[in-house]
Amino acid sequence: MAICNFFLQGRCRYGEKCWNEHPRGGGGGGGNRYQSQNRYQEQSRYQEQSRYPEQSRYPEQNRYQEPAGNAKGTWGASSQRYVQPSNFSKSTTWINRDSEKPSAGSFSGFGSRNVKSTAATGLPSTQNRFAALSSQDNSRDGQTDKGNILDDIMKDMEIWESSGQWMFSVYSMLKEKKNISGFTDFSPEELRLEYSVCQAEGNPLKYINAVQQLGSKWKQRILELKNPNPSIKTALLNELNSPSPDVTPGYSGQQNSAFGALSFPTSNTAPTAVTFSFKADTTTAAKPAVPNALAGSDFSAFGNKPTSAPSFGSGVAAAAASFSFAPSTISGFGSTASNSGFGAASNAAGFQGAANIAAAPAFGVASSTAPASGFGGGFGTTVNTGAKTSSVRDLFSAGTAVPVQTTLLFGQATGSLNTTASSTSLAGQPFKASTSATAVSGSFTSDNTSNPLFTPRNELSVEDLAQFEAKQFTLGKTPIKPPSADLLKVT
């Protein structure tokens, strides 16, 4: 192996890792210098170690130190030493670091409350970390500071005013609490209906003034709640602490509107059938003798104003609209009445027995002598009536004296009718015409000798006869007319 020239000069930087030979002993002028350098490093490391006598208490650290005679330990020996600080101490005391943080119940709806935090004392804490959760009140009823409730209301009023939300509404701080007074509840549909009514009456200023009045009241109430004085604060707290009134189910609650009437009917009174709006009306219907779910509404479809008892109740004489949703006084199942819900007044049971009809029924047949079934008469019978006068108004017109001659649907009129009615029926003269109607024969009468189910033999063509006499029809030559009766064979 070649001798390292740099080692002989005393400046080989590879040391024992050099791939050339470094001669020992007297060879080379740089060998003694290298050995003396190693001895100097060992002495300096020993002196450095003697500066820290406390390290001798940890004999296990010697395992991390290499022998002094090993020249390999001269590089990076200081980085391999493991020194444990003498002032390190393990604490067995648990410290509640969460005590300095605010608990979950320390915040209100819109503000926060100060929380008194206890500093860590270094002793084991006996405080339950979840005590704040168990003692938290989920509702605002348990708050001792009433100022938070008032602050919440004030902020809600500011948000309501600045957000542009619907102002004709009520306000409640909690859904379990009752509404705060001073606000009215009207939907856009109700205002639109009132505008249509006022426009039809030719008085749109009435609607405009009412809406402006409601808007001014709303703004005034908002300002009072945004900047409440002591009297208003006291009134609010008393109102919130007072028990909620019992709520009646359905639409039985009363509400005073700006248009001067009740918005919805109560259980004892019902609005008339003039309009369904905010108008004031002094006429109300009598209390029903027997309540009925189908007869609770007195609103007429065409604006007529009935005053009558329900349809399934006692017999009370009343004048109702001929076709409306007003309660009629006829009983559907056997009791007597004076007027029908569809314009027919009858003294008979709905589906049985003979009847003496005292007014024109719904389809123009009036009878006083002939027994009638539930549908006005038998098939093919003739109905003769005398001179009767009806007070039932027509659906589309006023009463006119019209002599009518008519028949049943499946019958044939054999005599002229001399019935004079003050109005026509639903199928009568709809536009106040005063004419004499001719007798109309039914679709199927006893005088009709032709049978539409068969075709006479002399009316069939030769091709049709050939097809009917054959065992099966030929494609494209199937007859259109029915066959004659003698061509049918029952097998």
Curated annotation (Swiss-Prot):
Q: How the protein sits in the membrane?
A: Peripheral membrane protein
What's the subunit arrangement here?
Probable component of the nuclear pore complex (NPC).
Free-text comment about domains: The FG repeats are interaction sites for karyopherins (importins, exportins) and form probably an affinity gradient, guiding the transport proteins unidirectionally with their cargo through the NPC.
Q: Which protein, by its recorded name, is this? A: Nucleoporin NUP42
Keywords of the record, alphabetical order, are: Membrane, Metal-binding, mRNA transport, Nuclear pore complex, Nucleus, Protein transport, Repeat, Translocation, Transport, Zinc, Zinc-finger
Question: Would you say which domain of life the source belongs to?
Answer: Eukaryota
Q: Where is the composition biased (Polar residues)?
A: 33-64
Gene3D superfamilies according to UniProt: Zinc finger, CCCH-type
Question: GO molecular function: any one?
Answer: nuclear export signal receptor activity
A single GO BP term for this record reads:
protein transport
